[in-house]
Amino acid sequence: MMRVLRHYQDVPEDLQGGVVAIGNFDGVHRGHRAVIGEAGQFARATGVPLTAMSFEPHPRVLFQPDQAPFRLTPFRAKAIQMAGLDVDLFLALHFDAEFAAKTAEDFVQNVLVDGLKARHVVTGYDFVFGKGRAGDAGLLRRSAGEAGFGFTQVPALRQDDGESGEKGDIYSSTT
């Protein structure tokens, strides 16, 4: 049974040490499912928990407050979709000004290493994080080597299988 938590400090030991898929996962579309699916393969292969980490509210609410709220999927519906993807923990981190002020390095150390004790981290091709969006795949790759966790960046998925939309359109994976 999937658990839903809002704070990384509250993650119980039995859900630490797993594989963490990170993204906004707004809509949980094909690109998002690819990120979570990749993370799920690592988790199943190693017998560790699968965590899907998202941010609530969506960071755009904080950074672009004058625009209409950006939400493709209400929180409860997103949680139900996560449960359907065999996620053990849906960690919907409370995103506010204090959290947004964390540097990318602090996010890696405090959230991924100390809080979740992540064994492996999976993101989409366009995931950025930390104050000023300073963290990216390069930083995660370096941090993984230093801290001892694995890292996978899922490439962009292109729409070329006859589905609606223009051939070659990219499915957003984490934004």
Stretches found by the model and what they are:
Residues M1-T175:
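Nucleotidyltransferase catalytic core that binds NTPs
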